[in-house]
A protein has these predicted regions:
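RNA pseudouridine synthases
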Residues: 1-141
């Protein structure tokens, strides 16, 4: 079976032989969640990097973003690079920043959230599927 060419619903911001930095738009899934035929960033990157994959490379998403979230995604193109980025993530040596849209007018210009985060829909009604909230049972930010 011949795979269809990638749709390129995203932009490559930076690329080397080892990794790519992708600007993911909102509502583009990172990985397949169910077999409904919906295109994902991972599938599109596999099509885009088919030559590298044929030569022994891979597509490893280092940091994921929720479906509603837009932003930069780091993609390793080799197993050893994916392992190294994974170690850096575990040790929190890769910095992640989020710009949040808030309701109202906060009294602060910027703030740091260092609290447990969980899916709001697990604890109260949320119109957004993966809307995050501070909750004691959540994972560290």
């Amino acid at each position: 079976m011949i795979e269809s060419p990638p749709l390129l619903d995203f932009k490559i911001i930076d690329e080397t032989d080892d990794y790519a930095v992708v600007d993911k738009p909102p509502f583009l899934l990172i990985h397949p969640t169910k077999p409904d035929g919906r295109r994902t960033l991972w599938q599109e990157l596999r099509g885009l990097f088919a030559f590298e994959i044929a030569a022994g490379g891979q597509v490893s998403i280092v940091n994921r973003l929720d479906r509603e979230t837009s932003g930069l995604v780091l993609v390793a193109k080799k197993a050893d690079v994916a392992r190294r980025f994974g170690q850096l993530m575990q040790r929190r040596q890769l910095k992640k920043e989020y710009l949040a849209i808030v309701w109202g007018w906060p009294e602060w210009k910027s703030t740091l959230v260092d609290a447990a985060l969980d899916r709001q829909g697990k604890h109260q009604h949320s119109a957004i599927w993966l809307k995050q909230m501070i909750h004691p049972s959540g994972a560290p930010a």
